[in-house]
Amino acid sequence: MLELNFSQTLGNHCLTINETLPANGITAIFGVSGAGKTSLINAISGLTRPQKGRIVLNGRVLNDAEKGICLTPEKRRVGYVFQDARLFPHYKVRGNLRYGMAKSMVDQFDKLVALLGIEPLLDRLPGSLSGGEKQRVAIGRALLTAPELLLLDEPLASLDIPRKRELLPYLQRLTREINIPMLYVSHSLDEILHLADRVMVLENGQVKAFGALEEVWGSSVMNPWLPKEQQSSILKVTVLEHHPHYAMTALALGDQHLWVNKLDEPLQAALRIRIQASDVSLVLQPPQQTSIRNVLRAKVVNSYDDNGQVEVELEVGGKTLWARISPWARDELVIKPGLWLYAQIKSVSITA
């Protein structure tokens, strides 16, 4: 568990945090440049020192301004991966990985190298590596110090799109197989969507929202970030069944289900899906003999006018689903809170 209750002033910027983060999964730190994202992880790592408050990691006090406690970075057991890999140019990859390696991680070296796909790189110098390869090595080096927490400061920001696509699967694999909590700084919605379990949104040094990805994603805090055509819902589902005759998989959503193209996943596997609001249409009665496979009973929570369109907030199985319709459709269907209807879903994207 990471307890953050501190304030810090750097120049004209003030950062104030009072949150407790669980010791598992990935928490994305999201916001515009200057929001306080890097300042937050620098304070946690010990690169800067808050003027007030405390930082406590798994019961160990890293910083207590009142008591004058401020552990040096090397004593905090916190790994840090920067935007630029910062590898030692005169060491080969193997030497970079072993630099600072904890004794407890010696037996894990080969496993971690395989997990990150860097075994073919061990005898190469950093100067011969691509940006994505350098970042994989930097992540491996940080993990081999046996940290209790891993901080990643926009590790994909300096990479072009092909290199980002190269690195994302390795990060996803790490989240599944390495039980180390991570704070992932980013201003990329795509990275957050594919990696994060939770999101903390910072604005001018203040926390505007903090919670599970699917909750924060559907909140008003995220509206300025989402292009109108990309308003969407994030839902947690589980694999219910694979169709015996068609290449389709059913995903459980409360007591209902969604059909998607067949997935290579076992039954009961947990997944996250994304549904664009523009791919959801509404009807008052269940349609007969329709080509749309996904028709879910839903309850209207509210509706909002938005630049000539209407965003309708629905509840399906205790989860939030958004639909975008025209004002004409809203008036004709008499959309209002409490109305039960049916949501027809044309397309579903699997995100994690």
Curated annotation (Swiss-Prot):
Listed NCBIfam families: modC_ABC, Mop, PRK11144.1
UniProt topology in membrane: Peripheral membrane protein
UniProt family annotation: Belongs to the ABC transporter superfamily. Molybdate importer (TC 3.A.1.8) family.
One annotated Gene Ontology cellular component of this protein: plasma membrane
Binding-site residues for ATP, renumbered to this chain: G31, V32, S33, G34, A35, G36, K37, T38
Source species taxonomy: Bacteria, Pseudomonadati, Pseudomonadota, Gammaproteobacteria, Enterobacterales
First-level EC class: translocase
Annotated InterPro entries: AAA+_ATPase (IPR003593), ABC_transporter-like_ATP-bd (IPR003439), ABC_transporter-like_CS (IPR017871), Mo/tungstate-bd_C_term_dom (IPR008995), ModC_ABC_ATP-bd (IPR011868), Molybdenum_import_ModC (IPR050334), Mop_domain (IPR004606), P-loop_NTPase (IPR027417)
Protein keywords: ATP-binding, Cell inner membrane, Cell membrane, Membrane, Molybdenum, Nucleotide-binding, Translocase, Transport
Main location (coarse class): membrane
PANTHER family found in the cross-reference section: ABC TRANSPORTER I FAMILY MEMBER 10
Pfam families in alphabetical order: ABC_tran (PF00005), TOBE (PF03459)
ABC transporter domain segment(s): 1-229
GO MF: ABC-type molybdate transporter activity; ATP binding; ATP hydrolysis activity
Record function comment: Part of the ABC transporter complex ModABC involved in molybdenum import. Responsible for energy coupling to the transport system.
Domain Mop, residue spans: 289-352
Assembly, per entry: The complex is composed of two ATP-binding proteins (ModC), two transmembrane proteins (ModB) and a solute-binding protein (ModA).
Subcellular location: Cell inner membrane
Superkingdom assignment: Bacteria
The reaction(s) this protein catalyses: molybdate(out) + ATP + H2O = molybdate(in) + ADP + phosphate + H(+)
EC number from the UniProt entry: 7.3.2.5
Protein name according to UniProt: Molybdenum import ATP-binding protein ModC
